[in-house]
Amino acid sequence: MSVAPGVILRGRTVVGGCAEGEALVTRETISGWGGIDPTTGTIIETRHPLHGVSFKNKILVFPGAKGSSAWSAAFHVARLAGAAPKAMIFTVMTTKVALGAVVLRAPAVTDLDQDPLTVIETGDWVRVDADLGIVEVFKRVKI
C-alpha cells in the first residue's frame, strides 16, 4: 500500500494533542456500554457494520455516541486496558462523546470544514493535530 498527498481538514479541538495512524471509519454511531468490548477495543454491537472490528490504536472516525451516559466509562476502561483508539474524529458533538474524549485523553476534533465520513476511508493514514484543529488525510492508493 502507498499513500497519495494529503487532504487537509480544519475543525474544532475537543481534546488537544497529536496522533497519527490508520483510520477506522463508520457512518454509524457507536454504543459505548454494551456496544464495545473495552478490554479489546472491539465493537460487539451485533448489527453494527464494524461488528468484530477493533479500534485499538486506530484513528476512529465516526458520527458520534449513542446509548447511555456510561459511554464515557466504556472508553475510559478501554484506555486503562490499552485498547483505546489513538484519536477520535466525529461529526456530532454530544455530552457523551465529549466526556468520552476527555476520559480517553486522546486527541479529538469535531466540526470539520469537510465531512470526514466522506473524505476519510478505512485504511487511509491520518495525522491529527488537535491542538491546531487540523486533520491531514493521506489517501490509501490501491496498487
Predicted segments — roles?
Residues 2-19, 24-136, 142:
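Feature captures the catalytic cores and cofactor-binding loops of soluble hydro-lyases/lyases
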